[in-house]
């Protein structure tokens, strides 16, 4: 199987690509964020291209290791008829970035285009609020050989786009998938709006084409639509070629050239790409790849880890941030950036554990209270009465009492039920109000039973 992708994602700008209409179309009433330009009314001329969109596209191209097109850049008119395209053509630039690479997949080109409106054929309505919003299109070479590879590539690409701060992420992603099997012809699949959808579409299409080839039936070169509700693809039309779109330079828009000075200025401002950060975290901090990927899942989380690792043992910091911090963020359905937790808060909490001011069990309770809380970990610990680790003699007394009062758990442990130990540890924690160290408590229990 050979697979290539064309990914479209909205750029995060305040105004549209060729006019000054706002881009917050999702909450606006239908056909309110519009003007004669984004409706392509007769006599309406486009503004010069949105500078933020151009810079965003260049930043993303650089993060994908593309070389920036040194030639004059200009916009073309791509002609086709559809109800969401009032002019009968879509403005799309020639490539701004070429010959990049991500996850072992070659990037053929990166360019900018305008989003069409939203057509709802079941209702017979068109909303032009989205019309003219800047898109970035990323075109890969057909380097992926399985649905899993395509899914992994898309996940990594979304991470790059989120790190860039220039794109709106998976929620605005639309992908076209090109797939061919040996002995068959290339088929394009449209109407894919998620990473999961791309994976399911490829799985279905791969099986469909295999079955056709086994029966000696020709695989037609065509465009198919993915029906997400049924997880199948259906034929739309024969595959178009570039000449079918009748590309011509747009006479209303001036050509542009990105100077070396502009490109290098942008290169200095782009963040380290997530896949490069993963590699550096493994080399610099001795982390496993799995841990490094979790800690780089958000740019803000990765930056926080680096700050914490400057004061706390990196492996200890990674353990707590990977397991406990991510657990709490997931439970609260918020990102690290939204949590209001600072690197200083994490340093303070981990230092309290290291100094044996609190137990690891107490620290887990404290970190659960930290999101969206203006109080620091020490203040939270004081209010909850969690400061202090009791003397071991008190722990021993609690252990012996737990063993005496729960002979059934002791018998279960001797019968091979390891979970019985956890029950006894829980009893000790209850008696000591969580101030006994769980690991040492387990040792004391095992010594006595």
Curated annotation (Swiss-Prot):
Keyword Protein biosynthesis: yes
PROSITE patterns named in the record: GATB
MF term (GO), any: ATP binding
GO BP terms, alphabetized: glutaminyl-tRNAGln biosynthesis via transamidation; translation
Secreted is among the record's keywords: no
Keywords per UniProt: ATP-binding, Ligase, Nucleotide-binding, Protein biosynthesis
Source superkingdom: Archaea
Pfam families per record: GatB_N, GatB_Yqey
EC identifiers of the protein: 6.3.5.-
Catalytic activity: L-glutamyl-tRNA(Gln) + L-glutamine + ATP + H2O = L-glutaminyl-tRNA(Gln) + L-glutamate + ADP + phosphate + H(+); L-aspartyl-tRNA(Asn) + L-glutamine + ATP + H2O = L-asparaginyl-tRNA(Asn) + L-glutamate + ADP + phosphate + 2 H(+)
Known partners and oligomeric status: Heterotrimer of A, B and C subunits.
HAMAP family registered for this protein in UniProt: GatB (MF_00121)
Summary of the function given for this chain in its UniProt record: Allows the formation of correctly charged Asn-tRNA(Asn) or Gln-tRNA(Gln) through the transamidation of misacylated Asp-tRNA(Asn) or Glu-tRNA(Gln) in organisms which lack either or both of asparaginyl-tRNA or glutaminyl-tRNA synthetases. The reaction takes place in the presence of glutamine and ATP through an activated phospho-Asp-tRNA(Asn) or phospho-Glu-tRNA(Gln).
PANTHER family associated with the record: GLUTAMYL-TRNA GLN AMIDOTRANSFERASE SUBUNIT B MITOCHONDRIAL AND PROKARYOTIC PET112-RELATED, GLUTAMYL-TRNA(GLN) AMIDOTRANSFERASE SUBUNIT B, MITOCHONDRIAL
Family: Belongs to the GatB/GatE family. GatB subfamily.
Official protein name in the record: Aspartyl/glutamyl-tRNA(Asn/Gln) amidotransferase subunit B
Provenance organism: Methanothermobacter thermautotrophicus (strain ATCC 29096 / DSM 1053 / JCM 10044 / NBRC 100330 / Delta H)
Name of encoding gene: gatB
């Amino acid at each position: 199987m050979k697979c290539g992708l064309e990914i479209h994602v909205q750029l995060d700008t305040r105004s549209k690509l060729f006019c000054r209409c706002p881009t917050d179309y999702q909450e606006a009433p239908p056909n309110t964020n519009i003007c004669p330009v984004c409706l392509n009314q007769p006599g309406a001329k486009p503004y010069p291209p949105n500078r933020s969109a151009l810079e965003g596209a260049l930043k993303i191209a650089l993060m994908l290791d593309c070389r920036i097109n040194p030639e004059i850049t200009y916009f073309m008119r791509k002609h086709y008829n559809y109800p969401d395209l009032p002019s009968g053509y879509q403005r799309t630039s020639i490539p701004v970035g070429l010959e990049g690479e991500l996850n072992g997949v070659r990037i053929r080109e990166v360019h900018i285009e305008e989003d069409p409106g939203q057509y709802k054929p079941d209702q017979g309505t068109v909303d032009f609020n989205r019309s003219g919003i800047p898109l970035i299109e990323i075109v890969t070479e057909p380097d992926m050989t399985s649905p899993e590879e395509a899914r992994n590539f898309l996940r990594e690409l979304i991470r790059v786009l989120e790190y860039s701060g220039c794109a709106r992420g998976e929620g605005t992603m639309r992908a076209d998938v090109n797939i061919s099997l040996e002995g068959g012809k290339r088929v394009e699949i449209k109407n894919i709006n998620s990473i999961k959808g791309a994976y399911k579409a490829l799985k279905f299409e791969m099986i469909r084409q295999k079955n056709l080839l086994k029966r000696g039936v020709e695989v037609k070169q065509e465009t198919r639509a993915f029906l997400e509700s049924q997880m199948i693809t259906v034929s739309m039309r024969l595959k178009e070629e570039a000449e079918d779109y009748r590309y011509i330079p747009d006479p209303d828009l001036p050509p542009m050239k990105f100077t070396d000075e502009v490109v290098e200025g942008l290169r200095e401002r782009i963040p380290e790409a997530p896949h490069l950060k993963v590699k550096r975290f493994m080399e610099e901090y001795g982390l496993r790849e799995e841990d490094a990927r979790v800690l780089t899942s958000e740019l803000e989380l990765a930056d926080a880890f680096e700050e914490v690792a400057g004061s706390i043992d990196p492996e200890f910091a990674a353990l707590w941030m990977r397991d406990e911090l991510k657990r709490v963020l997931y439970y609260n359905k918020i990102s690290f950036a939204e949590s209001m937790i600072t690197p200083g808060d994490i340093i303070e909490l981990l230092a309290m554990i290291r100094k044996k001011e609190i137990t690891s069990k107490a620290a887990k309770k404290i970190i659960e209270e930290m999101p969206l809380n203006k109080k620091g970990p020490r203040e939270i610990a004081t209010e909850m009465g969690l400061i202090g680790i009791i003397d071991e003699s008190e722990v021993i007394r609690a252990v012996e009492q737990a063993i005496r009062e729960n002979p059934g758990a002791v018998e279960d442990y001797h019968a091979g039920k390891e979970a019985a130990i956890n029950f006894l540890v829980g009893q000790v924690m209850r008696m000591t109000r969580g101030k006994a160290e769980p690991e040492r408590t387990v040792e004391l229990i095992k010594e006595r039973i």
